[in-house]
Amino acid sequence: MLLILLSVALLALSSAQNLNEDVSQEESPSLIAGNPQGAPPQGGNKPQGPPSPPGKPQGPPPQGGNQPQGPPPPPGKPQGPPPQGGNKPQGPPPPGKPQGPPPQGDKSRSPRSPPGKPQGPPPQGGNQPQGPPPPPGKPQGPPPQGGNKPQGPPPPGKPQGPPPQGDNKSRSSRSPPGKPQGPPPQGGNQPQGPPPPPGKPQGPPPQGGNKPQGPPPPGKPQGPPPQGDNKSQSARSPPGKPQGPPPQGGNQPQGPPPPPGKPQGPPPQGGNKPQGPPPPGKPQGPPPQGGSKSRSSRSPPGKPQGPPPQGGNQPQGPPPPPGKPQGPPPQGGNKPQGPPPPGKPQGPPPQGGSKSRSARSPPGKPQGPPQQEGNNPQGPPPPAGGNPQQPQAPPAGQPQGPPRPPQGGRPSRPPQ
């Protein structure tokens, strides 16, 4: 993330400085005197590149493509190169600070970067990708990549995981202003990446999976949202702390992260739906991957959360209220429902299964991992809904090793 942002900033600065003297004012007559502008659009059909307002140098505008439009950013700081290639790319940048290179591909729209800090490169490739720009404050990473109609609006003020990477109509969740955002969508059909609000950096969004939904509560950081295929929505990560990388590979492994405070052993890799909720006060491992309609639970503000679910079919996971970190959302299982009672920790919500909803964890304490796989198992705490299983998370203050992988149809309960 940092390397990408740094590289984008360096490219924008270097291109702006190199093009300051090379670009003649004949190509940009509307350019205000005293402020250099990047090179206007080159090649393509009907390229439009309105000049940037006075203030700082601008990178080169869109090149090639059919009817690319790249309005220059308002005065303030240099802007990276606008969209290149593609059909009808539009990327008007807001005034203020430098922006990374806009979208490249077909009908891609680069999200506007609000003034304040540099923005990462916008979506590349794909059909009709849309990436609304982030609010002013800090740089934004690249928007969603691939995926089918993923949606993930993030809450303003704090960092969010990387937006969904899917195939069609993927929308990256907004990262609140103030901090950098992950890389925008690349490829795919009709990806949309609404920009994050100012505040903190956003991690990479969900990849793969069908119709994952996981809106996080504002106030604290959330791990990377679900990565699924169709209509995946990355859960919003509330502002607060950094987010870990989302799970990759394995067969729907669950490794609920430990509460912030102390280190945790390596989370489960491979295997069948292993479950292991971590105690509060310590760092959290990567969240669930796969599952049907699993929604990643929101991580309350204040502590970091592991990465959310990736893949799976239509994962749904309502996020927990703010207060303490929550384990990974549900994986596996058939329609598990188990909202935990407020005030106590709840394990990671169910992962996988059909139309499973992870119970929200009330603010105050972390939540242990809920059901994983099996048919409607019942755990100890939750009063509400269905036959959910919710094992209690271990007390805070002690490190937790890797969770035990379950053997057989029923999920293993985490250590207390």
Swiss-Prot record:
Glycan-carrying positions: N168, N230, S232, N272
Regions of compositional bias (Low complexity) in chain numbering: 34-47, 290-300
Gene: PRB2
Upper classification of the organism: Eukaryota, Metazoa, Chordata, Craniata, Vertebrata
Main location: secreted
Record flagged with keyword Metal-binding: no
The protein, known as: Basic salivary proline-rich protein 2
Pyrrolidone carboxylic acid found at: Q17
Highest taxon above the source species: Eukaryota
Source organism: Homo sapiens
